[in-house]
């Protein structure tokens, strides 16, 4: 993404990040350990991700209700305590300028800023910054101190405030304590108790950048330029001090966090209105990160041997920059300094590339963090100059120079978005400071009518089953609507009926022509029903789509000899196209959906691995994934109505035939010569063709763990259990976005 650097210089420092990180050549080598199955057979599906964060690792217990505990919290008292903390400087880590505001802004930013829109992973929603690898990323150096400074507050309020809420709330309080009016704040994040296994990049060294190919093309879904960074290298790409090339990196990485140019410029300029970076001396004097630090340091890392190691001697990034003359006050001084001087390339005391006002201009106008009688020259990062040199950023920031009120408004909105981007719809937010829903929160209208009851539900099911739509059509449409959900950032799902809107209605996986016919039929049923009702009772299309799926499952179960009722709770509403950001929703389009036997053409990753990824996004366990595959194959719900994996002679009957026939030793499988990613099953004795399948189907007979699950549902006495488990898993998926039911 960047051009070659036009500036010649001596070399690159290893100490680089968007804000701060020490020089660490590579992660600590692993100690000898027994080999795992994953080591021996790395290509097997990684099912452990479906069982992470179990109740066994949670000390709060299965019945802990964070919402109920939070309701007991005095949020105003909490806010006062956090703000008081800002100016309570501790000798073991003294506050720059007597105020921890800059440190806490950085902590909150880096907690939330790992979010990436491509797969919804990262973000501050679970307090993951407390654990490896994030707690030891080079870019998060010294944030261990920020979390320790917060401990007395956490200790005081206990289970009424989660770490994940507190880590991001502290930054909000920091801004307000320095005179900034924030846009709002929502609590409601719940803690995890073990590290998440997330693909952060292919590198095995800190600050490695093997993630690029071609003309600096960043591999998806990654959102940072180097391993261990949140966004970009503040010295420039790979330490090359080129502001224009750095702008390209900035635009790419912030865009992958769902920020546009205005939001990006606002966050950088707003965040750098406060505090400083730290590079008082040689970065090689900084000790190991928290996960590699000696046990006696009790989880604190990056202990420095330079001088006192703290305060005026602190080293974090190797950069030594104070951006403004008022680093503990909100004003427009960052932009005034940025545009008020011409800049020349210099080096910090640690040898990192940074910029200083030319010809000694402004000398003494910038305060020293610990000596009020001393003054400094204005300094900036390479990435700061990007806001002035890149034409698009320059147009935005130069306007703000003359219109500071616009800058303040844009920073407030961008900061709010940064802290909350991974939390899903506003209905999940808690507390008194939640503003109205924003477009990026995928809003849906409030229910403004009486909901359907049992009698209306029964009548609508009858209309649906008499409409001429097949079980396959009913089930496929309901699944397509609900299975857009991502548990990583709580986006997607059936609420809103966005399957009828752009972009979802046009996705290949949804078979647009077929989908249109189904939706037209359901919309007619909806209109006829709503026009015939009195007393304000109505049904939304979102509810009707899910109800239609339930009716289809019930009919299929009846076809197999089972009389069941699929749970259904009305209350969904229909979003409008104006409430739907097409570009933002585009990232939800599945590259694969093994539940419908869909694989995007040209996809390089194994289909079975993508199935596990889809199951993870749907918060499914391995048994739930297994029973859903078997049931959806029996219901003939494949993309394009292919017969792959439909191992039954009675499709649209909810039977366990998929498992019975998959495990039948009378079938021999081989790769199909006529189609990629397709297998053909033939009779072991006669050689007659029997079935076709994909890797998603066959993995349930090939993988030992999945085969064990398949065997449970293939036994002679498993039919009832299969139906019950399928209905339970189906209902779970249909309600993944029903946060109003929690």
Swiss-Prot record:
Formation of the three residue Trp-Tyr-Met cross-link is important for the catalase, but not the peroxidase activity of the enzyme. The keyword Transport does not apply. One of its GO terms (molecular function) is metal ion binding. One of its GO terms (cellular component) is cytosol. Keywords: Heme, Hydrogen peroxide, Iron, Metal-binding, Oxidoreductase, Peroxidase. Heme b binds at residue 272. There is a cross-link at residues 109-231 (Tryptophyl-tyrosyl-methioninium (Trp-Tyr) (with M-257)). This is Catalase-peroxidase. It comes from Rhodococcus opacus (strain B4). Its EC number is 1.11.1.21. InterPro entries: Catalase_peroxidase (IPR000763), Haem_peroxidase (IPR002016), Haem_peroxidase_sf (IPR010255), Peroxidases_AS (IPR019794), Peroxidases_heam-ligand_BS (IPR019793). GO terms for biological process: cellular response to hydrogen peroxide; hydrogen peroxide catabolic process. There is a cross-link at residues 231-257 (Tryptophyl-tyrosyl-methioninium (Tyr-Met) (with W-109)). Transmembrane segments: none annotated. Its cofactor is heme b. SUPFAM superfamilies: Heme-dependent peroxidases. Signal peptide: none annotated. It catalyses: H2O2 + AH2 = A + 2 H2O; 2 H2O2 = O2 + 2 H2O. Binds 1 heme b (iron(II)-protoporphyrin IX) group per dimer.
């Amino acid at each position: 993404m960047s051009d070659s650097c036009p500036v010649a210089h001596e070399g690159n420092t290893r100490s680089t990040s968007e804000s701060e990180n020490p020089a660490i050549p590579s992660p600590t080598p692993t100690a000898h350990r027994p080999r795992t199955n994953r080591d021996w057979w790395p290509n097997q599906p990684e099912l452990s991700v479906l069982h992470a964060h179990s109740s066994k690792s949670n000390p709060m217990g299965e019945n802990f209700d964070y919402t109920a505990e939070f309701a007991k919290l005095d949020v105003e008292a909490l806010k006062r305590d956090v703000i008081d903390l800002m100016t309570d400087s501790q000798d073991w880590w003294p506050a720059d300028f007597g105020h921890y505001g800059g440190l806490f802004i950085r902590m909150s930013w880096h907690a939330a800023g790992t979010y990436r829109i491509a797969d919804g992973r990262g973000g501050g929603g679970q307090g993951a910054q407390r654990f490896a690898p994030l707690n030891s990323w080079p870019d998060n150096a010294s944030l261990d101190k920020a979390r320790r400074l917060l401990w007395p507050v956490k200790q005081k309020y206990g289970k009424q405030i989660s770490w994940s809420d507190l880590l991001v709330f502290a930054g909000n309080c920091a801004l307000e304590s320095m005179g900034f009016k924030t846009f709002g704040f929502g609590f409601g994040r719940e803690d995890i108790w073990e590290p998440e296994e997330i693909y952060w990049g292919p590198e095995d060294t800190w600050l490695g950048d093997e993630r690029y190919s071609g003309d600096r093309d960043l591999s998806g879904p990654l959102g940072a330029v180097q391993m261990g960074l949140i966004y970009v290298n503040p010295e420039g790409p790979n330490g090359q001090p080129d502001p224009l090339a750095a702008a390209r990196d900035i635009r790419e990485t912030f865009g992958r966090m769902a920020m546009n140019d205005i939001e990006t410029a606002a966050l950088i300029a707003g965040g750098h209105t406060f505090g400083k970076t730290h590079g008082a001396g040689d970065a090689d004097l900084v000790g190991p990160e928290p996960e590699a630090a000696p046990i006696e340091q009790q989880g604190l890392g990056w202990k420095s041997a330079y001088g006192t190691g703290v305060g005026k001697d602190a080293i974090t990034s190797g950069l030594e920059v104070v951006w403004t003359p008022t680093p503990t006050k909100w004003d427009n001084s960052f932009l005034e300094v940025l545009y008020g001087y011409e800049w020349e390339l210099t080096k910090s005391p640690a040898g990192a590339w940074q910029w200083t006002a030319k010809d000694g201009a402004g000398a003494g106008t910038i305060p020293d963090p610990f000596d009020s009688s001393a003054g400094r020259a204005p300094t900036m990062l390479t990435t700061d100059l990007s806001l002035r040199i890149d034409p698009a950023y320059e147009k935005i920031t130069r306007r703000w120079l003359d219109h500071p009120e616009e800058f303040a408004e844009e920073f407030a909105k961008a900061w709010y978005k940064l802290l909350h981007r991974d939390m899903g719809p506003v209905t999940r937010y808690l507390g008194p400071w939640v503003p109205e829903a924003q477009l990026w929160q995928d809003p849906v209208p409030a229910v403004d009518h009486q909901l359907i009851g049992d009698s209306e539900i029964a009548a609508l099911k009858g209309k649906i089953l008499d409409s001429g739509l097949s079980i396959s059509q009913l089930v496929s449409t309901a699944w397509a609507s609900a299975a857009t959900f991502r548990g990583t950032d709580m986006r997607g799902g059936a609420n809103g009926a966005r399957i009828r809107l752009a972009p979802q209605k046009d996705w290949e996986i949804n078979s647009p022509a077929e989908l249109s016919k189904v939706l037209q039929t359901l919309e007619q049923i909806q209109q006829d029903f709503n026009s015939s009702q009195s007393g304000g009772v109505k049904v939304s299309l979102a509810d009707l789509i899910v109800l239609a799926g339930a009716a289809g499952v019930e009919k299929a179960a009846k076809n197999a000899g089972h009389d069941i009722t699929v749970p259904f709770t009305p209350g969904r509403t229909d979003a409008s196209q104006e409430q739907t950001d097409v570009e933002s929703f585009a990232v939800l389009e599945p590259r694969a959906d093994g539940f419908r036997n869909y694989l995007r053409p040209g996809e390089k990753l194994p289909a079975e691995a993508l199935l596990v990824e889809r199951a993870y996004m749907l918060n499914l366990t391995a048994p739930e994934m297994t029973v859903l595959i078997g049931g959806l194959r029996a219901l003939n719900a494949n993309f394009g109505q292919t017969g792959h994996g439909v191992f039954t002679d009675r499709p649209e009957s909810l039977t366990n035939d998929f498992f019975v026939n998959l495990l039948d030793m009378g079938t021999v499988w081989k790769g199909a010569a006529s189609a990629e990613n397709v297998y053909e099953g033939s009779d072991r004795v006669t050689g007659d063709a029997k079935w076709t399948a994909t890797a998603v189907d066959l993995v349930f007979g090939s993988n030992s763990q999945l085969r064990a699950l398949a065997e449970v549902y293939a036994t002679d006495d498993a039919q009832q259990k299969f139906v019950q488990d399928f209905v339970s898993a189906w209902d779970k998926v249909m309600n993944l976005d029903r946060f109003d039911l929690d």
